[in-house]
């Protein structure tokens, strides 16, 4: 049985405080089961963990926020090449709706990438989500790259940690305006900012 959802595409500056609070609750509930550390950035009314998205795709149902995907245009450095991407992040589906196919509805975001003139969508996920992303790939062109180190700055400068961290996450690339063969080769990606 599929949940009936209504999708809303909105720019970050269109969100009201009450919506940030509702999204923060959603992220604590969605990311909390993966570990309390993952829910910590969403304390209070903060509805982002690292970099703040510029555009959000939010699904609502009768119980509130059902799913979310954030987007941020940025240049990442792959080897010596600066590559414009639409970074995807802050992805989540409410736990009671997992497995119902709602996550695949995020393909509604793909035409938006064309409007934003980004040649690739880019994101990173932990290896435990590889099967989920592979299923997502059945509905459109998705390339999963492993063995790539991704450098990101921390969301806030801290005295007790270095200013950057390096992850060995899976890299997700969706070709939008170009062929995947145009994606630069390299084993290190520098976000030049915090993860979305």
Swiss-Prot record:
Gene Ontology cellular component list: cytosol
Main localization, broad class: cytoplasm
Domain of life: Bacteria
Cellular compartment(s): Cytoplasm
Keywords, alphabetical: Acyltransferase, Cytoplasm, Nodulation, Plasmid, Transferase
EC supergroup of this enzyme: transferase
Enzyme Commission number(s) of this protein: 2.3.1.-
Job of this protein: N-acyltransferase required for nodulation. Acts in the production of a small, heat-stable compound (Nod) that stimulates mitosis in various plant protoplasts.
Protein name: Nodulation protein A
């Amino acid at each position: 049985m599929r949940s009936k959802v209504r999708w809303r595409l909105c720019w970050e500056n269109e969100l009201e405080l009450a919506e940030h609070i509702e999204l923060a609750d959603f992220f604590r509930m969605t990311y909390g089961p993966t570990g309390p550390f993952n829910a910590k950035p969403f304390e209070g009314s903060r509805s982002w963990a690292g970099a703040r998205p510029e555009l959000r795709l939010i699904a609502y149902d009768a119980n509130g926020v059902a799913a979310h995907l954030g987007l941020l245009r940025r240049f990442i450095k792959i080897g010596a090449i600066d590559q414009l991407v639409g970074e995807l992040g802050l992805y989540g589906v409410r736990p009671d709706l997992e497995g119902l196919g709602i996550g695949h509805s995020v393909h509604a975001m793909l035409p938006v990438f064309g409007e934003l003139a980004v040649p690739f969508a880019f994101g990173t996920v932990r290896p435990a989500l590889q099967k989920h992303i592979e299923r997502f790939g059945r509905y459109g062109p998705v390339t999963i790259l492993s063995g790539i180190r991704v450098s990101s700055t921390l969301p806030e400068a801290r005295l007790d940690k270095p200013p950057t961290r390096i992850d060995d996450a899976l890299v997700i690339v969706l070709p939008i305006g170009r062929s995947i063969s145009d994606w630069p080769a390299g084993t290190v990606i520098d976000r030049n900012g915090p993860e979305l």
